[in-house]
Amino acid sequence: MPSNCEILCEIIIAILLPPLGVCFRKGCCTVEFLICLVLTILGYVPGIIYAIYVIVFQHREEYFDEYRRPIYSA
């Protein structure tokens, strides 16, 4: 699980170069990276929005999984 500092650094990188931020999180040969690359070429702001979405909101259940477990098992 990445720390808050790592997520913040990825967001800053995603604002400067959106495909690079997605590449750090998902890899360079993924569909998410290609979508971000196309969105950045078509318009810089949509690329930023998508990169932040990928970094922050995808697979967020991994971060909150420990809070969903029951305290007592029956």
Swiss-Prot record:
Localization per record: Membrane
Mind naming one GO cellular-component term on file for this protein? Answer: membrane
Bilayer-crossing residues are 4-24, 37-57
Name the keywords, alphabetized: Membrane, Transmembrane, Transmembrane helix
Keyword Membrane attached: yes
- Name the Pfam families on file: Pmp3
**How does the protein's chain sit in the membrane according to the entry?**
Multi-pass membrane protein
DNA-binding in keyword set:
no
Give the record's family classification.
Belongs to the UPF0057 (PMP3) family.
| Protein name per its UniProtKB record | UPF0057 membrane protein At4g30660
